[in-house]
């Protein structure tokens, strides 16, 4: 019964329609892991009129912010996998917001196909934002962190 096609169809339909990001099916001798992007339950939400007006009035502010952010770069994931902020559970993270990083310094680990891939900084700067959480599934080219480049 566990291996019947109806069971699998129901499992897949439930997974696709729900707000799940990870599913795990355990068998006696093996496990199956299924990953997908987390759905956005607010994607069809309409902002109230006042909020829409406020949003459009901030366009000038956003232009100024973009100008200030020229020295901020995104660190992208080179592969899809599980994001780890430290070398092992319970260990201190490699970096935190405000950490100064140097070229070649390990920022995080992406586990893909049972291989731990260290993601290193290719520039000198300070961590501005960490966009992924420990244990999250990340996709190729997803922003992991933002670094403010050091002014030379």
UniProtKB/Swiss-Prot annotation:
GO annotation terms (biological process): fatty acid biosynthetic process
Disulfide bonds: none
Main location: plastid
Positions of the Biotinyl-binding domain: 72-148
A single GO cellular-component term on record: chloroplast
Function: This protein is a component of the acetyl coenzyme A carboxylase complex; first, biotin carboxylase catalyzes the carboxylation of the carrier protein and then the transcarboxylase transfers the carboxyl group to form malonyl-CoA.
Protein known as: Biotin carboxyl carrier protein of acetyl-CoA carboxylase
């Amino acid at each position: 019964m566990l291996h019947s096609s109806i069971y699998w169809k129901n499992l897949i339909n439930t997974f696709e329609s729900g707000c799940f990001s990870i599913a795990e099916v355990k068998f006696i001798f093996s496990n199956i892991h299924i990953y997908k992007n987390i759905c956005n339950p607010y994607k069809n939400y309409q902002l109230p009129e006042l909020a829409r007006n406020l949003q459009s009035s901030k366009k000038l502010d956003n232009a100024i912010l973009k100008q200030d952010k020229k020295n901020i770069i995104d660190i992208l994931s080179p592969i899809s996998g599980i994001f780890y902020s430290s070398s092992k559970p319970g260990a201190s993270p490699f970096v935190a917001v405000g950490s100064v990083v140097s070229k070649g310094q390990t920022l995080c680990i992406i586990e893909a196909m049972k291989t731990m891939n260290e993601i290193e900084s290719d520039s000198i700067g300070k961590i501005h934002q960490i966009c992924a959480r420990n244990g999250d599934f990340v996709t190729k080219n997803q922003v992991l962190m933002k670094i403010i480049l050091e002014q030379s």
